[in-house]
Regions:
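Short, charged, low-complexity patches
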Residues: 19, 23, 80, 162-166, ...
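Active-site-proximal acidic secondary-structure segment that organizes catalysis
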Residues: 130-182
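Hydrophobic "lid/gating" helix adjacent to the active-site nucleophile
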Residues: 20-57
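Helical lid/core segments from catalytic subdomains that handle acyl or acyl-like groups
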Residues: 1, 63-118
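Acyl/amide activation-and-transfer machinery of modular secondary-metabolite enzymes
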Residues: 1-13, 54-78, 149-155
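Aromatic-residue-lined binding/catalytic grooves and analogous aromatic/hydrophobic interfacial grooves
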Residues: 4, 14, 18, 33
Length: 184
């Protein structure tokens, strides 16, 4: 597990300007960055290693006024705003904790703790040696020197993904967020 500070200033400004969910936008950008790093697309089936075309996000979502979250899973697609709209629609329409049919693909698990400034997070569970599902979590963003940052935790199976790959993910995520400074 690796945790690092992620500057999200441009993302927060972008989501505010475009009336988008910061959370859904962060899920989308992390998913896009992960899918750009081939090592994150490795999966193990029946003892054999494969590279999948993409991983889809599967993320916790807490409906307004509720203390019972649900798991939302859907393809990220190619458009940030479209993903945010689709995620919101799916969350409103989904009445069960988890849609088992949507969980059948190659996934990335996401969680967010917006109530605390995250310094590290380890997901519970007994992950087997062939578990290749990346787990991404982040906490509340805080302001320092006019910039918003948050602690972002990346939990992976070290048999398949190394620090080099986490660095590649972080660089791609940074680039995607910085690119929003010049958009909408």
């Amino acid at each position: 597990m690796v945790t690092f500070r992620q500057d999200v200033t441009a993302l927060r400004k972008y989501t505010n300007r475009n009336s988008l969910s910061f959370y859904y936008a962060m899920v989308y950008l992390c998913t896009r960055a992960i899918n750009e790093v081939p090592a994150f697309r490795l999966t193990c089936r029946d003892g054999a290693l494969f590279t999948v075309d993409r991983r889809d996000p599967s993320f916790t979502d807490l409906p307004a006024g509720s203390e019972a979250f649900k798991i939302i899973t859907l393809p990220a697609g190619d458009d940030l705003a479209a993903f945010c709209r689709a995620a919101g629609e799916k969350s409103r329409a989904q009445t069960v904790f988890i849609d088992q049919k949507a969980e059948a693909g190659e996934l990335i698990y996401y969680s967010c703790l917006p109530w605390v400034d995250l310094t590290a997070l380890t997901n519970e569970g007994d992950h087997g040696p062939d578990d290749t599902v990346p787990r991404i979590s982040w906490g509340r963003y805080t302001e320092q020197g006019g910039r918003l940052t948050l602690g972002l935790s990346v939990e992976v199976n070290h048999r398949f993904i190394d620090g080099l790959h986490i660095g590649q993910f972080a660089n791609r995520l940074n680039a995607a967020i910085r690119a929003l400074e010049n958009e909408g």
